[in-house]
Design a protein with these regions (language model features):
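Arg/Lys-enriched, amphipathic patches
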Residues: 112-117, 126-127, 150-164, 234-400, ...
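Conserved catalytic palm subdomain of right-hand nucleotidyl-transferase polymerases, strongest
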Residues: 152-154, 487-496, 534, 545-554, ...
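Short phosphate/oxyanion-binding micro-motifs
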Residues: 1-147, 163, 172-181, 504, ...
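Short, conserved micro-motifs composed of acidic
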Residues: 188-209, 214, 727, 742-776
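Active site of divalent-metal-dependent phosphoester/diester hydrolases
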Residues: 64-79, 161-168, 179-206, 265-269, ...
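Basic, alpha-helical interaction scaffolds
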Residues: 251-284, 771-838
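Conserved polymerase palm-domain catalytic core
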Residues: 580, 619-706, 715
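Surface-exposed loop/turn segments and immediately adjacent short secondary-structure elements
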Residues: 230, 234-236, 259, 274, ...
């Protein structure tokens, strides 16, 4: 196979292989195919399900694999498409009753229809199963042949193609005749015991375009050979991926810092912008000598534990199996079995050695632990997007520079592409070089009658008489920011790694502080600090569509330092006028708080017999749509001094970006609207811009976090409720239109809740769009059902956790006790730590499911080991959530939480009594379902059961330390805990 592949390297190679359980053979497959990788690889009988993340089966040279799973015991297929081939999944062309994947492949501008399948034997009779298979396949082929000239079907059809007397052979041949298909595989493909058959097929309507169709013995599957064929098309290969990095092999930090200090003294500090440029160039020139830039080629990932002896054993096993299939003697069979067992033994030993080495010192270095286990437990951060091909104007583009320029044009004009309107700024209509005073005057006059500006003027408080100015910064503050840089963050456009900045912080702090203070004095943000490189990351959908990639900005670390200094001062001032309901990007605020407020508001209304409804709004490109001029006008209305406005205007204007694809970059383009979402200042500027939206909802029925906003309302009448939601939505849409933001009513979600068991599915008219309410919506990552029992959300959490536990059980014999503890804390418990108080009052069934997850996790530990904190008597998951609830109440009463949390946890009015002065007011309720089962009722019972000396602890840290033992038998106040449990 290797010789054949080498000779036809530029011809696409299609391969299909019934592997019979992928989870145990994936590393062997990677090793065998590393030298002869197919371009399209389909594996059948994978025997994996949703509990196995894609990251576990990721191959470096391929896109993220596509799967059609059955169960972890049978069936299933997985499809790999090599990077550089345009692939689009065709869900409408897929069979409903069998595992299959339909794809449209574009190779050299020619489209091919590929259907990969595995026909499993069902409980029904084989004849009925075959009939159903062809009955489903025929209409699909009818559609495919009318759209595509080139059809390829690959799969294990479980019908012996060569045996004319076999069941289903006649039906297969009739089907092939109808659609003009031929099977290009002529040899037997399956060798089960003493029976040989040809059940793996490659069918096509253009056999002349395929050549060297054959079977290949890999020695991995129990009884199947791999079938493959070459496409008679010349396909250019992607170039090897190369990366540029700084070599720290001979880096002398002391000599570098010594020379850096000398060089920086020679910089002129008359102009902050010029001084910043000189500092960066001086730093990079010196860094190029001490840590030169180097380039290296990235090879395909080999399994961590693969070594020479195991690799040789795998190759020898393949050869011995091939020899046995050619000549089935007892000696050849024995030799093959011995080699197969040796491979298993060597693999287990290699994995154990690798794990022992990686887990040898988890306390000081846990990175190897995450490197090994992460791909088996989650897809997060595991799949990259380095090789991209785009479809643009009916052309397929694979040149990195062309693609980078297309992305950059799209991202810099994303508002125009989304809404059809190009953002305008007053400076565009003024003579070039106009002073900021003239620009500000024009902006102020343009927006003086704007609804938002009027609303801001009407809501200004007395505390805002002193205009805000940016103040100079101290060397100590800059030094601390330099030392706090994350050394793992990406390197910005200036090529200076954060690690080197941390090393040289003592030398760099003084000159950098001086430059920053000059810029603050001159009201200028350095031009070089406004440059960004953009990395496109694939989201979902068609990979050849540029709209399916989100931009991730990479800024220089020095730019982040300057941004952090401005941000700290902006936060202090903006807190004086920001709505208390603005939750995102604020200290002490979280998604849990806004969701608790929403859910508790719903439950209170439902407890009183109201209908409750909510609209989840869809804001398209919210950060990108912000008008620079309108933002400046709003900040002016909020009493920002002219000098501060000039500095912010300088920060926003003239920002430029390029897009990077591998080692290629696009041209720079100027950003004309929006605030950079990945920047330090972007989030706080977004909050300032959107703050006045809350002024238009005097009933405080707007709930938001970042660009996710929901409107809630209630009524005793369903029709009246629908009218209220429609009117409220119009208010929000009008605000968005007036503020040049894009609302998409057709994508709004709606939910209606009531106290009865019936679901209410109705239409709500919003600006001419009929929005159908649903019984389940997703908000900020939480699935919320119309009965607020969170069964769906907790079910998903338990399913995810169950899959991760399955993985840990498979690795159990390789994991040390400390590694198991780390794995459970990092992955199992973390699943239930996101907004746990939101869904705490769930059904008993759901709570029991969570407890069972913990019990199953604890069974990973053998009785022979010291379990430490993981002893069977470990606190239940419910006790953990109650501890979290007590901490939230403590934070609320001590003003460490958003002020609106006082609406839920109200201090007791009886402050004169020494015994009751630390209590919170008990809440009345009418019904158990929505009244008693709520945080506002449960919280006071929990808090008031705690001893006063605990509730009055002076610091949050001391309170947390106490709560770690609350509920345990060794707790000082265990009797109080028992009384509380009996009370609820």
């Amino acid at each position: 196979m290797h010789v054949l592949r080498t000779k036809n390297l530029n011809n696409p190679f299609f391969a299909y292989y019934n592997i019979n359980s992928l989870r145990y053979k994936f590393d062997d497959l990677k090793e065998i195919l590393s030298k002869t990788p197919p371009d399209i690889l389909v594996l059948a009988e994978t025997k994996i399900d949703h509990t196995f993340p894609n990251a576990q089966f990721y191959l470096e040279e391929y896109y993220e694999p596509t799967r059609s799973d059955n169960s972890c015991h049978s069936g299933g297929i997985i499809e790999y498409i090599r990077k550089g081939i345009i692939r689009k999944r065709l869900n409408d062309f897929e069979l409903k009753s069998f595992e299959n994947i339909a794809s449209e492949l574009t190779i050299n501008k020619v489209k091919y229809f590929l259907l990969s399948f595995y026909r499993t034997e069902r409980k029904e009779s084989k004849i009925a199963n075959i009939k159903r298979f062809f009955d489903e396949l025929s209409p699909i082929l009818n559609k495919a042949t009318s759209k595509y000239d080139n059809i390829i079907l690959m799969g294990d059809i479980n019908i012996d193609f060569k045996d004319t007397n076999s069941i289903g052979n006649r039906e297969l041949k009739d089907f092939m005749n109808v659609f003009g298909l031929q099977n290009v595989i002529k040899d037997n493909t399956c060798f089960f015991r003493d029976n040989e058959s040809s059940i793996d097929v490659i069918l096509t309507n253009t056999p002349r375009k395929l050549f060297h169709s054959n079977t290949f013995e890999l020695g991995i599957s129990d009884c199947h050979k791999m079938v493959g064929t070459y496409l008679r098309v010349h396909m250019s290969r992607l170039k090897s991926k190369k990366i540029t990095y700084r070599s720290l092999k001979n880096f002398d930090s002391e000599a570098f810092c010594l020379e850096l200090g000398t060089k920086l003294k020679q910089i002129s500090y008359e102009n902050g912008n010029v001084a910043f440029d000189n500092l960066v160039s001086t730093y990079t020139d010196l860094l190029d000598r001490f840590a030169p830039l180097k380039c290296k080629t990235i090879r395909g990932n080999q399994s961590r534990f693969m070594n020479k002896s195991l690799s040789k054993a795998i190759m020898k096993r393949s050869a011995l199996k091939s020899k046995y299939l050619k000549k089935k003697t007892s000696e050849n069979r024995t030799n093959f079995k011995k080699q197969r067992n040796l491979c298993t033994k060597l693999r287990d030993q290699a994995i154990k050695n690798d794990f022992d080495e990686a887990f040898s010192d988890l306390n000081s270095n846990s990175k190897p632990f995450y490197d090994i286990l992460k791909p088996y437990l989650t897809n997060k951060g595991a799949l990259c997007n380095t090789d991209i091909s785009l479809s643009e104007n009916n052309n397929i583009l694979s040149n990195d520079i062309e693609i980078a320029n297309i992305f950059n044009e799209y991202y810099t004009n994303i508002v125009e592409h989304t809404s059809g309107n190009r953002p305008k700024n007053k400076a565009d209509d003024l003579p070039t070089g106009s002073s900021f005073d003239i620009i500000l005057d024009n902006i102020t006059k343009t927006y003086e009658d704007h609804p938002s500006i009027k609303a801001i003027h009407n809501r200004k408080s007395d505390s805002q008489h002193t205009p805000f100015k940016f103040k100079p910064v101290k060397i100590k503050n800059v030094f601390n920011l330099l030392k706090s840089l994350d050394a793992k963050k990406a390197v910005g456009i200036d090529g200076i790694p954060p690690l080197i900045l941390k090393i040289s912080a003592k030398i760099l702090a003084e000159p950098l502080t001086r430059i920053i203070n000059i810029c603050i004095s001159d009201n200028v943000f350095p031009t070089l600090a406004k440059l960004a490189s953009i990395l496109p990351f694939f989201k979902k959908g068609d990979r050849s569509n540029k709209k399916n990639y989100r931009p991730v900005s990479v800024l220089s670390s020095l730019s982040k330092i300057f941004g952090k200094i401005l941000q700290n001062q902006l936060i202090d001032f903006s807190n004086s006028f920001l709505s208390k309901y603005i939750t995102s990007y604020r200290k002490g605020h979280s998604t849990q708080h806004v969701l608790i407020r929403l859910i508790e508001d719903w439950k209170a209304k439902l407890d009183n017999g109201f209908y409750v409804g909510a609209i989840m709004m869809d804001l398209s490109k919210a950060f990108d749509c912000i008008s620079h001029d309108l933002l400046i006008a709003k900040m002016n209305a909020y009493k920002f001094d002219k000098s501060a406005l000039k500095l912010i205007y300088s920060y926003l204007k003239g920002r430029r970006q390029c897009v990077k694809i591998n080692s290629s970059s696009s041209n720079y383009q100027t950003i004309i609207s929006g605030v950079p979402q990945g920047s330090i200042l972007g989030p706080i500027l977004f909050n300032i811009f959107i703050n006045d939206l809350y002024f238009f909802f005097p009933n405080d029925n707007l709930f938001g976090f970042a660009d996710d906003h929901s409107i809630s309302n209630s009524s005793t009448s369903l029709e009246e409720l629908k009218g209220k939601l429609s009117d409220d939505s119009k208010v929000a849409i009008d605000w968005l239109d007036n503020n040049q933001m894009i609302a998409n009513p057709s994508k709004f979600q709606a939910i209606i809740l009531n106290k009865s068991k019936d679901h209410i599915l109705t239409d709500i008219n919003i600006e001419g769009h009929n929005i159908k309410s649903s019984d389940l919506v997703t908000l900020l990552g939480i699935d919320i059902d119309d009965k607020i029992n969170f069964d769906s959300h907790i079910g998903k959490l338990c399913t995810k956790t169950g899959g991760q536990l399955n993985c840990l059980y498979r690795f159990n014999k390789y994991l040390s006790v400390s590694a198991k503890k780390l794995a459970i804390n990092s992955y199992i418990y973390s699943n239930f730590s996101y907004c746990p108080l939101v869904w705490h009052c769930s059904s008993t069934k759901s709570k029991n499911s969570i407890e069972n997850m913990q019990k199953r996790a604890l069974k990973l530990f053998d009785d022979s080991h010291s379990l430490g904190d993981f002893k069977p008597g470990k606190s239940s998951m419910e006790v953990k959530r109650l501890r979290s609830l007590a901490i939230e109440i403590y934070k609320t009463l001590n003003h460490l939480n958003p002020n609106y949390m006082f609406e839920i946890f109200k201090p007791s009015e009886n402050r004169s009594s020494e015994r009751l002065k630390h209590n919170i007011a008990s809440q009345r309720f009418k019904q158990v379902k929505f009244g008693k089962n709520s945080i506002r009722v449960l919280g006071p019972k929990l808090w008031n059961s705690l001893p006063n000396q605990v509730k009055s602890l002076p610091t949050l840290e001391s309170f947390k330390n106490f709560m770690k033992t609350w509920g345990n038998k060794d707790c000082k106040y265990y009797d109080k805990y028992i009384s509380y449990v009996q009370a609820i």
